């Protein structure tokens, strides 16, 4: 008893039932089960919650680009630069002039104040951009290597980033920087994942 219809003889498949006693049921069953060549317009995808949307190739391309390590590093660098510039501008604006007010020195002109403000803002911005880029690159590399997205990635990345940045001041500063940055990253991840 074959489930596939005879390709050469259509009349024999209609007249002689293959699966059921009724030829109409047999034709219907063979159309739904046996015909593997038919074009399927509607694909039924089981859904759990809400509607199921199949992504187009363009959406998949954009999603892949946005989730890449290069894009994450670039975004962290740009956003770190912006945050550092804002903090640098704020700290430069509240920084008091350390010159003695009773000394006979000339006061700073507006141009000198703005030049100093610009250099402070740029210095903060560069440092924050560097920290953001290094942290993002290390975290993305660890996440890609481990294949898991959890709080440990941020902790490891924080330890490595803090260690690398603190290493400029010595080994002891590198160890303290790594531990501090790892603890801070863990606290931030815990706060973000617990909400």
From Swiss-Prot:
Indicate where this protein resides in the cell: Mitochondrion inner membrane
Major subcellular site = mitochondrion
The UniProt keyword set, sorted, is: Membrane, Mitochondrion, Mitochondrion inner membrane, Protein transport, Translocation, Transmembrane, Transmembrane helix, Transport
One short Pfam name that applies is Tim17
Would the keyword Cytoplasm turn up in this protein's UniProt record? no
Question: Which cellular component appears as one GO term in the record?
Answer: TIM22 mitochondrial import inner membrane insertion complex
Query: Where do the record's region annotations for Disordered lie?
Result: 1-20
- Give the molecular function GO annotations: mitochondrion targeting sequence binding; protein transmembrane transporter activity
Q: Which residues cross the membrane?
A: 74-94, 128-144, 164-188
Membrane topology note: Multi-pass membrane protein
**BP GO terms, sorted:** protein insertion into mitochondrial inner membrane
Family under the similarity heading: Belongs to the Tim17/Tim22/Tim23 family.
Outline what the protein does: Essential core component of the TIM22 complex, a complex that mediates the import and insertion of multi-pass transmembrane proteins into the mitochondrial inner membrane. In the TIM22 complex, it constitutes the voltage-activated and signal-gated channel. Forms a twin-pore translocase that uses the membrane potential as external driving force in 2 voltage-dependent steps.
SUBUNIT field: Component of the TIM22 complex, whose core is composed of Tim22, associated with the 70 kDa heterohexamer. In most cases, the 70 kDa complex is composed of Tim9 and Tim10.
Q: What is this protein called?
A: Mitochondrial import inner membrane translocase subunit Tim22
Q: Which organism is it from?
A: Drosophila melanogaster (Fruit fly)
């Amino acid at each position: 008893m074959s489930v596939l219809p005879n390709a050469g003889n259509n009349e024999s498949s209609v007249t002689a039932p293959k699966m059921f006693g009724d030829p109409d049921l047999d034709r219907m069953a063979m159309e739904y089960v046996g015909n593997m060549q038919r074009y399927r317009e509607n694909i039924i995808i089981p859904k759990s919650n809400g509607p199921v949307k199949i992504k187009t190739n363009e959406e998949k391309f954009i999603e892949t680009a946005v989730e890449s390590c290069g894009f994450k590093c670039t975004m962290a660098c740009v956003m770190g630069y912006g945050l550092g510039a804002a903090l640098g501008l704020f700290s430069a604006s509240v920084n008091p002039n350390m010159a003695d007010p009773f000394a006979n020195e000339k006061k700073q002109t507006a141009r000198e104040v703005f030049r100093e403000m610009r250099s402070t803002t740029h210095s903060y911005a560069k440092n924050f951009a560097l920290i953001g880029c290094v942290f993002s690159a290390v975290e993305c590399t660890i996440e890609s290597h481990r294949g898991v997205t959890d709080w440990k990635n941020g902790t490891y990345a924080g330890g490595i980033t803090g260690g690398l940045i603190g290493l400029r001041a010595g080994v002891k500063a590198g160890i303290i920087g790594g531990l501090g940055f790892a603890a801070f990253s863990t606290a931030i991840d815990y706060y973000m994942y617990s909400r």
